[in-house]
Structure formats: C-alpha cells, structure tokens
C-alpha cells in the first residue's frame, strides 16, 4: 500500500518526504525511483507509477527532491542528487531490494532529473528511462523566453539570475544541466523518449531537440543527429525522409514510433505524441534490464500500451 513517509537526508540533516510502497513477499524485488515533474512535488503524478509497481510487485519510492524547480535547492542542485541517493539507501534499508534491478524513471522535470542522476550517479542504477527531458537548462531558458513560457523565470530564480547574461547564473545552469554530466553515463542503459509535437503551442513545453542533444552526447559520432536534422524535426513536427523509422513498437500503442536509434548504450525514440510519459511502456522496458547482463532493446508487447489520454504531463 502506498504511503507518505519521511526519510533522513544527509546533506542538511533534514527529513524529506516521499511516497513509498514495498513489494510483497520475502523475495528480493526490484526498486523503481519515480520522479515528479518540473512544477510539482512528491504528491503529484505518483499514482500511475505506483499502479505499475503494484502490478510488477516492485518496491517504489517517489521522493520530493526539494519540490518545484524554482527553488535554488531544487532544479538539479546538489541537494537533489543527495536526496535521491538517500531515497535509494533508505528503501534498501527497510525493504528487500534486488540490487541488480534498481531503476529510475521520470518525465518533463522528472526527465531532466533522471538524465542528471544518470550522469551524476550512474553507479546507482541498472537502467534509466527518461521522457520529454530537459537536457540543457540554459538553452531551455532561451526556448521558454521565445515561447513566452514562465519556466524561464523559474530557472532565473533557481540559478540566481539570467543564465544568458549573468556569468554566475550561467555556471549554475550548466551545473544543473544533464548535458554537463551525461558523459559519465556511457556504460548505463538509457532510453530517452519524446513526442514529436512537444514544444509546440498546446502540445507541450519541451522541444524534442532537448532529447536529441542528450542522445548525441552518448551516441557514437556516426550515429549523432545533425543540427540541421534536429532543427527540421523541431520546426516541422515531422521526421526527415532519410531518417524515417520502420520499427514498430506495440508498447507505444497508437503512438507510432517515428524515429528510433540505438548507439552504444543509449536509445532515442521520437514518437507520435506530445508531452507524454507512458509508464507501462517505460516499466516494461526497465523490467528486462538486469545489471551485468546485455541490454534488451527489443520492442515491447502490446499489453504495455496505455490509454493515450492517461499519460500527458503538466510541466
């Protein structure tokens, strides 16, 4: 049963809240760390994760990690990293966790944080599933200003100024950006997913080039997506003909996979969707990953598909 808990956080010796549920039985079971979105906290968006974890009989924690991302202690800070480390430690102390199967998943602001933790603490995770993530805080600040989205004010509040004009704020933005840390995740199985219409009016707040640039950090040089192709995808909400994908993934249901590429240990999927996270599809892929074993990149079953209206995120 899901419950709200407090757990000890070492960085400032406070107790921070989280939603938590333990797997049943005496057998060691996987742990999923789920992450809230940009403007929310541990009381939002956890129920879909919790339902999936109940189905799989996984341990589950959904930490606060300092709340909405307009606070300096939030938005990819050292507090965030330390609190999530402590969340994993806490569950491993109070529940029977299979240490070879500790997973991380989040979308939007949780996508940002999942990529950040992939880069800053790759040793913690068996695999990471990131959806509609922000990979470059300074660049997203620029994008939000251009789209007249108030998230740029959140970034300025968290970073202590405008990262486009203030050197100290720019440094903060880079430290809080996954793109600065992702090279550390070269050995970690990482699935990055984004809807092609994200970042367009009424369809989402994070343009797909944020996912593309994260993929490019970890991909082999010959597999990286060019700047021109990335800008074409963002502007036109379609895939260039020479990049069209023929792979079918039933786990995405009616949201057709438009582009998919695997390189090294990272996979990028661009699907016909908006600012979405498909929890069942995410957990089905994670469930096949075991530390020390080959990565499973096969498409998922149709049984993993969700109702398309059930997983649209609010940043």
Residue ranges and their predicted role:
Residues 75-95:
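Alpha/beta-hydrolase active-site loop
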Residues 26-29, 34-73, 137-138, 200-202:
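Short substrate-entry loop that stabilizes the transition state in hydrolases
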Residues 40, 92-94, 100-149:
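Primarily recognizes the serine-hydrolase "nucleophile elbow" in alpha/beta-hydrolase
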Residues 260-313:
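Catalytic active-site module of serine/aspartate enzymes centered on a nucleophile-bearing elbow/loop
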Residues 44, 126-127, 133-134, 138-184, ...:
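Mobile cap/lid helix-loop segments that gate and shape the active-site cleft of serine hydrolases
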Residues 163, 196-264:
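Active-site-adjacent alpha-helix of alpha/beta-hydrolase-fold enzymes
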Residues 1-25:
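N-terminal cap/lid segment of alpha/beta-hydrolase-fold proteins
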């Amino acid at each position: 049963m899901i419950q709200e808990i407090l757990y000890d956080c070492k960085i400032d010796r406070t107790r921070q809240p989280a939603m938590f549920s333990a797997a049943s039985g005496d057998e060691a079971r996987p742990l999923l760390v789920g992450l809230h979105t940009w403007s929310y906290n541990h009381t939002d968006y956890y129920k879909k994760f919790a339902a999936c974890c109940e189905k799989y009989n996984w341990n589950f924690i959904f930490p606060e990690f300092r709340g909405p991302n307009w606070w300096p202690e939030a938005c990819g800070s050292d507090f965030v990293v330390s609190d999530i480390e402590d969340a994993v430690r806490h569950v491993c102390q109070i529940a029977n966790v299979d240490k070879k199967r500790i997973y991380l998943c989040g979308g939007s602001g949780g996508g940002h944080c999942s990529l950040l933790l992939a880069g800053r603490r790759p040793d913690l995770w068996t695999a990471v599933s990131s959806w509609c993530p922000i990979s470059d805080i300074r660049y997203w600040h620029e994008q939000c200003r251009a789209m007249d989205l108030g998230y740029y004010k959140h970034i300025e509040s968290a970073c202590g100024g405008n990262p486009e004009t203030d050197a100290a704020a720019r440094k903060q933005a880079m430290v809080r950006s996954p793109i600065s840390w992702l090279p550390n995740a070269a050995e970690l199985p990482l699935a990055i997913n984004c809807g092609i219409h994200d970042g367009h009016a009424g369809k989402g707040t994070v343009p797909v080039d944020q996912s593309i640039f994260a993929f490019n950090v970890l991909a082999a040089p010959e597999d990286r997506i060019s700047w021109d192709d990335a800008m074409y995808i963002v502007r036109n909400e379609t895939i260039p003909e020479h990049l069209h994908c023929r792979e079918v993934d039933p786990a995405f249901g009616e949201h057709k996979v438009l582009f998919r590429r695997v390189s090294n240990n990272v996979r990028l999927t661009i699907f016909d969707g908006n600012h979405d996270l498909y929890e069942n599809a995410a957990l089905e892929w994670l469930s096949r990953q075991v530390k020390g074993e080959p990565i499973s990149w096969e498409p998922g079953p149709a049984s993993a598909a969700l109702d398309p209206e059930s997983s649209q995120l609010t940043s």
